[in-house]
């Protein structure tokens, strides 16, 4: 996915009220960005480091600028826009990058499914193949060299694991796909120290037949895309 028009840069001052961040531009002026990330962004906030943001020409938007990337103290990059994970996953599936998810005829998004009033992120279907239900999660939490999900207690994430297990019990294929939007993460594990129930459910889900995949993003101020698989430690 290319950033069009090109991203602009500034220096992070603060994130507040969950969805807002103040940034200083090169001329010394300050602007407020929309922060498209509902998580805690634990270990992703580095005041004084460079951020990259997009600008919308929609006059109805209260905040025209959206925070897209964050530079780390180690000169790495973090994808802040968690909502882009589904688009990145769809793009990678269509290009055959995620080899485990090739060979299907159609791809649909946000399809109702399950017993708990859910919508699946991606549904793959093909002739003479079980339907494949894919739940996509953005992973950005890095601690002591290990990537973790979630970065806060996630009742929604727990629900999705139950739904995926239900799909397997119905004879379908179910996949949990971690989109790793942190250039310094090379393996993903459940964050049992943050959400022990999620970690427990993930182990149960794997035993029930839910597949878990993780793919790292290649990121720059001009584009972002899924590039290669990485290790998952359940």
Swiss-Prot record:
Q: Which InterPro entries match?
A: SfsA, SfsA_C, SfsA_N
GO molecular function terms noted in the UniProt entry: DNA binding
Got any disulfides in this one, which pairs?
none
At the top level of its lineage, which domain of life is listed? Answer: Bacteria
As for family, the record states: Belongs to the SfsA family.
- What PANTHER family would the database entry show? SUGAR FERMENTATION STIMULATION PROTEIN A
Q: What is this protein called?
A: Sugar fermentation stimulation protein homolog
The gene for this chain is: sfsA
């Amino acid at each position: 996915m290319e950033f069009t028009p090109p991203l602009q840069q500034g220096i992070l001052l603060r994130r507040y009220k969950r969805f807002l961040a103040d940034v200083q531009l090169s001329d010394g002026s300050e602007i407020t960005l929309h922060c498209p990330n509902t998580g805690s962004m634990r270990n992703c906030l580095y005041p004084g480091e460079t951020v990259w943001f997009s600008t919308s020409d929609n006059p109805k938007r209260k905040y025209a600028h959206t925070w897209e990337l964050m530079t780390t103290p180690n000169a790495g990059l973090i994808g802040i826009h968690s909502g882009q994970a589904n688009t990145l996953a769809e793009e990678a599936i269509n290009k055959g990058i995620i080899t485990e998810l090739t060979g299907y005829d159609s791809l649909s998004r946000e399809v109702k499914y399950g017993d708990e009033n859910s919508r699946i992120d991606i549904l793959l279907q093909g002739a003479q193949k079980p339907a494949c239900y894919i739940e996509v999660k953005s992973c950005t939490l890095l601690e002591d060299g290990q990537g973790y999900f979630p970065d806060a207690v996630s009742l929604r994430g727990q629900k999705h694991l139950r739904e995926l297990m239900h799909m397997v019990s119905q004879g379908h294929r179910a996949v949990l796909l971690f989109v790793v939007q942190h250039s310094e993460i090379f393996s993903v594990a459940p964050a049992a120290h943050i959400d022990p129930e999620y970690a427990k459910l993930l182990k149960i889900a794997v035993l029930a037949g839910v597949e878990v995949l993780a793919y790292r993003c290649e990121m720059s101020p001009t584009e972002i895309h899924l590039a290669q698989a990485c290790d998952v430690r359940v």
